[in-house]
């Protein structure tokens, strides 16, 4: 007999079902496991089912109701590293970046557990919220399977350059790297993306007056976007400092001012 398995959206434990109908019903309701439903942290309301808990209060609403450089940073970060599937959102980072995941969780007032995955040595947060996820995907023109389906940059032209630079910084922290470029004071930012994102990056960099260096990786569907002028790298780092942005410090500390 087949066994149907899903993950508790609150604690990450596997929940096993004998019958497919029970599995589908629980999936639709985003039900939590028995341990979590019995926990003192669960909140039950009249008219709700037993497993209908506070998990639905998690949302990404702050990312489209409070527009700021920090908000656009996080939007760029989840464009790079976040995952959207139906009414579900997930963000997973390696163990070394757990603190950064906790900062994001704090920013969106995430109330569930951040779950450790031993097989990948990573941490993740995840939740379902039909209204909130639909709203943010619509507001920022984010598509499902976003690796291959880029956002339309024209949907971002109403943002000023400070917000767009914050967006780029978030993308760099999610999909980019910062490395030495041959000498002590020389560095290079490299972003790797599917070739379908070429127009998006070309328009974003052009709007920010950053020289466009985009090349296709031979034999693949991948492009690399490079930023290496020292005055631009220092400007970006000063922008981070002046706006007190929460970023991945291990990356930006590579750029030295002297």
Question: Where do the protein language model's features map onto the residues?
Answer:
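Internal intein/HINT superfamily modules and their associated LAGLIDADG
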Residues: 2-20, 24-258
